[in-house]
């Protein structure tokens, strides 16, 4: 395990928000506007009229729904302009037709989007919360960073605001994919004046004075040895001998009242890999977190 030698500066130039114009989309909208304003980035507000539901209804019905979406976009833009929310922001509304993720992915590539804000209503399944289908596709397949405001995210304050006593949580298992997100976590903490808590969960129950526990704690300190964190970080090793590791991460996040969680994801191009491995833990955290979660693809 080597120390992180430098810190990246994620200079975001473009932010994408996928919206359905519903009341539930207002919180992700506030986050997206705040992030774009902080970085001076262009914000794209996109709505895709899914062609899936209009297969039998025909092209006229699809075009009618698209025109209605354009009117909704115009009303939203008018409201945001009148409130001053768009003042000084370079912005663009995009209305598309087709398979939702395919259209969004095309926008990401064409506009070189650096971060997509992923809002979701979510739904409850057996013993867990699930993201909606489009939100899940964004989480699993987007090449850019994904800022997910999950179904359990209750925070009113935006994670992008510079406020005193902010806390960001970086959860790592020390894999290459996980540590790929660390420089971004350090940069975000510095950007927003937050304390960064580095967390590792041991899936065993060693004594806190054992070599395994000590090595994990030392590992957290080592990866930040050459960093330039403005606020002194905190290092936490939790034990999870039973149950999912995600539950311990969520429990720690709640106890510390964190404002943002940052995690790394490995890259996969295979749809078959989208079930639960290797991103099961991150997916469960996104679904259950009471704050937004940023995931960074390796």
Q: Can you say where each PLM-predicted feature lies in the sequence?
A:
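Short glycine-rich, flexible loops that bind phosphorylated cofactors or substrates
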Residues: 24, 124-125, 177, 245, ...
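Gly/Ser-rich helix-loop-strand patches that form or flank binding pockets
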Residues: 1-6, 11, 38, 105-157, ...
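Rossmann-fold cofactor-recognition segment
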Residues: 90-94, 233-238
